[in-house]
Amino acid sequence: MKMTRLYPLALGGLLLPAIANAQTSQQDESTLVVTASKQSSRSASANNVSSTVVSAPELSDAGVTASDKLPRVLPGLNIENSGNMLFSTISLRGVSSAQDFYNPAVTLYVDGVPQLSTNTIQALTDVQSVELLRGPQGTLYGKSAQGGIINIVTQQPDSTPRGYIEGGVSSRDSYRSKFNLSGPIQDGLLYGSVTLLRQVDDGDMINPATGSDDLGGTRASIGNVKLRLAPDDQPWEMGFAASRECTRATQDAYVGWNDIKGRKLSISDGSPDPYMRRCTDSQTLSGKYTTDDWVFNLISAWQQQHYSRTFPSGSLIVNMPQRWNQDVQELRAATLGDARTVDMVFGLYRQNTREKLNSAYDMPTMPYLSSTGYTTAETLAAYSDLTWHLTDRFDIGGGVRFSHDKSSTQYHGSMLGNPFGDQGKSNDDQVLGQLSAGYMLTDDWRVYTRVAQGYKPSGYNIVPTAGLDAKPFVAEKSINYELGTRYETADVTLQAATFYTHTKDMQLYSGPVRMQTLSNAGKADATGVELEAKWRFAPGWSWDINGNVIRSEFTNDSELYHGNRVPFVPRYGAGSSVNGVIDTRYGALMPRLAVNLVGPHYFDGDNQLRQGTYATLDSSLGWQATERMNISVYVDNLFDRRYRTYGYMNGSSAVAQVNMGRTVGINTRIDFF
């Protein structure tokens, strides 16, 4: 198997300062968890909500190796990219990120840290679990949480030695190699871990101009190191984590709208291959202090990202390098213990993001357009969340968040030799709230109702546009009404909900492709029902089934798209999987069969570009060859179903990106301990 040398990256990680991580390996269930949910497990916000939690083994069984594969295990979630992995299109409960690639409707968190929007699609390293919260989460999580939030929780080092290597190969000359080592450096005081990952997912698209036949894929190299200072018998601990990810991609690869089974790009003669290189550095410093009644958490995180991007667009060649910097600080305090009548969470939050973009659109004989832009965005917020346990079966909860948002832009450039430029500043204040009530009908059956708000802040277009002034768009706001239920026993888990979400001042792209600008496009309503169930019908065997039906439309008073469907929102979706364990004299066999159905949806607000219903079937078979060795074979998209993942109008004709089709592979994992 081809391997990539990551030794310099590992050495650099081991030389980082010996500061520790804020997360303990064993936590009281009622404590506030830094790297997962912000609320305690007893709070109304944690119980009066639709949620799904997936463990690391479940992720592995489903072949989820990157965040864009999470829809396989998180019902109702849809993730694709619009052009390339920098610009994710996420929809959940009828709320879509099609409105703004840089301000998603669902924010991705890793160990409590919000990721840059251009880092939403990323490879998964040493994941412990993933949690999806559906519906607006604005009071606890702030901006860009209208549809919900995704929490990715990674494994924290503790006194238990862990280590493994993984390797695998799959279709289109793709491969994956991974190394992890974790455990005590000085038991009772200091713990550490290191993870190295090389993940190659090549494509099979052909550029007839260059002869390249492996376009449309990605190649990622990732390193992560964690240190945790947690003295025994002390009420405090500290931690530090650092990672670096570099991904090369040949996306921005399109075919003709009706040529979804074709491999040749729809591209002008002489056009070069599309190319993108993204590198992201992340650092997190965190701490925790526990008293008899309270637990305090502090987190400070930084992300630096730069990428270069070149792609053909009609007769133009586009070069678009960009730099991002983000820092986040949060201080939280939560009550501790199971016998309290009132549980509380209080927090202070700051997020600052800075971006620089250089862009050049060149014709074969002369420059067409060039520009340089700078944008900033800062959020200062204070929030609280309270739960009143009226009885041992009935609770009510409420939360509020005060947020102050500031943004600025400055840009200049020239178009066919004509200069342009402008600058501007804006600020805005938001007050968000949520109320909920829950009642336990039995020890296993809960019903709840919830009203919650979410928003995306005001701001400016990231990409400068010639001839347009620096005019800010206003904040987009949503309110959600929900009624749900959850039933859970040792053998059966069932949850269902019905919801209505109203969004006003929607932020939506409009204008010519590649020169689109954000503006407020009116209002939209989303209504839907969702169901999720798991039946453990025999020892080692389970059956999962889920489904949803959603109607998400612009209202009649929307200026541009009145009565149209909101783009990137499937009208319905469903999924089912069967997982099992068969004991044999040669080791356990673990079969899995899963089907996923995605309903029709549009890629544009005009509702001209429609992808119809499609279904995919995935299968896998694992073999526990020895106590420490596991081998699995899999076939994703067994029947090679082709479908569009994104599309747009290119002049008078439409082009589309399509999925990769059937993938066959084999993986091996060997544990050290």
UniProtKB/Swiss-Prot annotation:
Signal keyword on record: yes
Membrane protein topology class: Multi-pass membrane protein
GO molecular function: siderophore uptake transmembrane transporter activity; signaling receptor activity
Domain TBDR beta-barrel: 160-672
Keywords per UniProt: Cell outer membrane, Ion transport, Iron, Iron transport, Membrane, Receptor, Signal, TonB box, Transmembrane, Transmembrane beta strand, Transport
Motif (TonB box): 30-37
Pfam family, one: TonB_dep_Rec_b-barrel
Annotated TBDR plug domain residues: 41-155
Intervals of motif TonB C-terminal box: 657-673
Induction, as annotated: By iron starvation. Iron regulation mediated through the Fur protein.
Subcellular location: Cell outer membrane
Record bears the keyword Membrane: yes
GO biological process: siderophore transmembrane transport
GO CC aspect terms: cell outer membrane
Leader peptide range in chain numbering: 1-22
PANTHER family: FERRICHROME IRON RECEPTOR-RELATED, TONB-DEPENDENT OUTER MEMBRANE RECEPTOR
Biological role stated in the UniProt entry: Receptor for the bacteriocin pesticin and for the siderophore yersiniabactin.
Name of the molecule in the record: Pesticin receptor
Protein's organism: Yersinia pestis
Species classification: Bacteria, Pseudomonadati, Pseudomonadota, Gammaproteobacteria, Enterobacterales
